[in-house]
């Protein structure tokens, strides 16, 4: 019987952790395309993300390469505004949201949570083509460090020195500025949500396990310690049972 590929991935990740090998999510800094080893760790690649395994993944890779040429930076040098202004318009919404959800942009240089990346992208993608063009042309000079500052300069009409075409659009941008500063929900990444998103897009949790997202205060032993021979009375472990198998 052919094994489910997602189950194979899950078992590989679980086994790696037992041998103290870190398994990490795909990220733009490393920009690896497929699953593999790098500096004693195992990394998922961009094309291991569900919905990006085929042609869609190739398109994302091409978009990142084009952005590198356009702004003369390596992927690991991108900041969040580079990603929003130059990269996001080159990628379809489904693919970009998948990248945000697995933490592809949540690196040290970009420094954005997964939820914040999703939230600001959904605001940014509603700009008109003319407004996006204005931001693209002005960003190299103004070098905004965040989306709020970019929208602050964009909001005035063209007659007022900004980038909007009319008063109605000015009001829309000002309204979005309010929600950038005052999001209606917490934009930090909840551990259970991270587990859920990685299972959805990578086939299994990678950054955290269901156990790590749970209360483990009553446990005194890990699964690894049991496998290494620990035994005795009053052993308590916290584990996630994914399947039962008879031997």
What are the functions of these language-model segments?
Residues 1-247:
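Noncatalytic, beta-rich nucleic-acid-contacting surfaces in large DNA/RNA-processing enzymes
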């Amino acid at each position: 019987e052919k094994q489910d590929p997602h189950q194979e991935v899950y078992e590989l990740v679980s086994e790696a952790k037992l041998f103290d090998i870190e398994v990490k999510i795909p990220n733009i800094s490393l920009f690896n395309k497929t699953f593999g080893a790098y500096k004693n760790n195992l990394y998922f690649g961009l094309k291991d993300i569900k919905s990006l395994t085929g042609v869609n993944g190739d398109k994302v890779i091409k978009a990142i390469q084009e952005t590198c040429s356009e702004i003369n930076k390596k992927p690991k040098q991108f900041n969040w505004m580079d990603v929003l202004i130059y990269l996001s318009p080159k990628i379809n919404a489904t693919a970009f949201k998948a990248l945000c959800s697995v933490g592809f942009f949540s690196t040290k240089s970009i420094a954005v949570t997964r939820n914040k990346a999703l939230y600001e992208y959904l605001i940014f993608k509603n700009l008109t083509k003319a407004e996006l063009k204005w931001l693209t042309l002005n960003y190299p000079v103004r070098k905004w460090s965040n989306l709020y500052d970019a929208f602050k300069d964009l909001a005035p009409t063209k007659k007022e020195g900004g980038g909007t075409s009319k008063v109605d659009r000015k009001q829309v941008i000002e309204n979005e500025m309010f929600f950038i500063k005052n999001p209606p929900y917490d934009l930090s990444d909840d551990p259970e949500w991270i587990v859920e998103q990685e299972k959805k897009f990578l086939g299994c949790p990678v950054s955290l396990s269901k156990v790590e997202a749970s209360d483990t205060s009553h446990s005194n032993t890990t699964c690894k310690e049991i496998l290494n021979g620990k035994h005795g009375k009053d052993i308590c472990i916290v584990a996630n049972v994914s399947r039962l198998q008879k031997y």
